[in-house]
Amino acid sequence: YLKAHYPLYFMKQLLNGSIGSETKTKDYIYECKKNNIKVILPSINKSYDIHIVRDNTIIFSLSSIKNIGTNIAKQIVFEREKGSFKDIFDFALRVYGKSINKKHIEVLIDAGCMDEFGYNRKTLKENLDLIINYSEIGSLLDDDELRPEIVFYNEYTKIELMKNELNVYGFYLSNNPITEVKLKYPNIVNLNEINLYFDKFVNIAVYVDSIREIKTKNGDKMSFIEASDEIDKIELVLFPKFYRDNVVIKEGEIILVNGKVEKRFDKYQIVVSKVKEINI
């Protein structure tokens, strides 16, 4: 009933039930995208230790960020209940040293939690030592005029921002390099439309999530690859021919694939004919 009539809240509940499981969280994020449910980056002043719904949007939880977890998220929320964080200095002044260290703040910056403070992410990270030094003496001074000047830096490239997000979430939450690849290769098929191409050859651009290798009866190596684009997932099948041709595919790569769409146990898969690695 909840899934049919209140899909937004249903997905929020599933996401909250998956906190601590990167794999399940990623799966539910893909479900949200397939169902046009918007999930936005966490906010240091709006997010909680759980996922919440606001303005028909799921706001990602602080707890689901790598190296943050529930305890630190709750500590941030507890401090915020005394008043919203005014800026990065106010945040560091109020939470730094209370189980929250420099690495935690770096992760929060890379996750996009501090974007609302008006500085780009590279500027925040490059000034972090300055900010922390101030936080260690600022409570004694109580004088805003003594705050150091922020030195501005050009923002990370779009690809660097995406990689940083991947590092802190384990998946792409806001931007996805697959989108950039599709702009360069207009004949790419979206995975959520793969059912329209059954028994046909297609070109897809995917992120390699995991690789499972097996041996055939003849002792040859073949593999099954779990892959994804911005919206959906699919299984790729690589037969021994690829290993004889010295094709090497690694987890975490983005690849262009040409292959035939087949169906096995009611699930679509692609039997791969050609593979090309994409450097981003």
Q: Where are the language model's segments positioned?
A:
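Noncatalytic, beta-rich nucleic-acid-contacting surfaces in large DNA/RNA-processing enzymes
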Residues: Y1-I280
